């Protein structure tokens, strides 16, 4: 049995996807479309367009960088590193762009467990740029991977001090969770709950925090308030709460509601598949996964394909 909470942290680091300008309109058609696809999560299309831009010599540094980000998002970490290296070798790599590339390359190095290389990039960033919440988090995550717990803690504290948001607290918690150090991350969740909700999005975030803390009663209360405020994402989270409580019927109802309301119902189909797996209805799970795959972006696709493997393992039907 796999840990559903850990599956929610496939993407641990949130980094800027800022775009730089230049060149004439005709030359940048593929580049601009690639940037749009990258922002929208259409990573395979973005990769193809960036590769076309590279072959045409359009914005080489930015195009190599974009292709690297697409490869990173698609889970091709070694190839991502190669693209980032190529980007850094280009002429006229501005300071802001270099910071962006080094940050992404450090993430890729973490993914392939080349912690020394990741640390070297973090040190370069610290020496040449003003530290911000993202860089503190990245440095903390690298230190944690290298079992430098005190250094990790110090950097995470700096990250949260710079950006005391629900998302940052959840991100730090996720880093600890992925290292089986959940208790160390829980204090950030507790800190995030010290404020009050101002809108439906806040209620959704608070519900997510309570869910990670296994406080299902408060999670349910917050998420219902978010749903009353027309927050669609809260439907998926409430479905997960019901699943963990063993209430498959209500979980399915939430996931079905999400499928009917969301622009992209992939998360809802994935949730329905999880319910079917729990119920032992593997054929229905495969049907839901297939429906989800038809509408999924790259990140949802990873989860759907993972669950498809789980179903086939349970069916013993390879």
Predicted features along the sequence, with ranges:
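Register position in tetratricopeptide repeats
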Residues: 39-40, 73, 111, 145-146, ...
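Canonical tetratricopeptide repeat
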Residues: 66, 73, 97-104, 138, ...
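Start-of-helix register in tetratricopeptide repeats
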Residues: 28-29, 61-62, 96-100, 134, ...
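Short coil turns that delineate tetratricopeptide repeat
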Residues: 58, 92, 96, 129-130, ...
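Residue-level recognition of tetratricopeptide repeat
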Residues: 35, 69, 107, 141, ...
């Amino acid at each position: 049995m796999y840990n559903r909470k850990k599956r929610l942290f496939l993407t641990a680091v949130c980094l800027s996807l800022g775009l730089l300008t230049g060149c004439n309109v005709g030359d940048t058609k593929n580049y601009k479309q690639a940037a749009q696809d990258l922002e929208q999560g259409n990573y395979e299309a973005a990769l193809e367009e960036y590769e076309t831009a590279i072959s045409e010599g359009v914005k080489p540094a930015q195009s190599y960088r974009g292709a690297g980000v697409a490869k990173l998002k698609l889970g091709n970490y070694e190839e991502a590193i190669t693209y980032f290296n190529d980007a850094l070798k280009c002429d006229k790599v501005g300071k802001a762009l270099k910071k962006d590339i080094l940050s992404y390359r450090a993430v890729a190095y973490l993914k392939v467990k080349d912690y020394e290389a990741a640390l070297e990039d973090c040190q370069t960033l610290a020496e040449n740029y003003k530290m911000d919440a993202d860089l503190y988090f990245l440095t903390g995550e690298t230190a944690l991977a290298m079992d430098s717990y005190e250094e990790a803690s110090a950097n995470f504290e700096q990250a949260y001090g710079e950006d005391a948001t629900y998302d940052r607290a959840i991100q730090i918690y996720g880093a600890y969770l992925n290292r089986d150090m959940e208790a160390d991350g829980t204090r950030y969740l507790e800190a995030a709950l010290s404020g009050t909700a101002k809108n439906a999005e806040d209620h959704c975030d608070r519900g997510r925090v309570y869910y990670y803390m296994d406080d299902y009663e408060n999670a349910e209360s917050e998420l219902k308030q978010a749903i009353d405020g027309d927050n669609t994402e809260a439907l998926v989270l409430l479905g997960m709460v019901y699943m963990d409580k063993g209430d498959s019927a209500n979980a399915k109802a939430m996931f079905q509601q999400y499928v009917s309301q969301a622009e992209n119902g992939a998360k809802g189909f994935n949730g329905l598949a999880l319910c079917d797996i729990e119920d032992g209805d593997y054929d229905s799970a495969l049907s839901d996964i297939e429906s989800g795959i038809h509408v999924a972006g790259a990140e949802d696709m990873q989860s759907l394909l993972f669950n498809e493997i789980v179903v086939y393992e349970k069916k013993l039907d390879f």
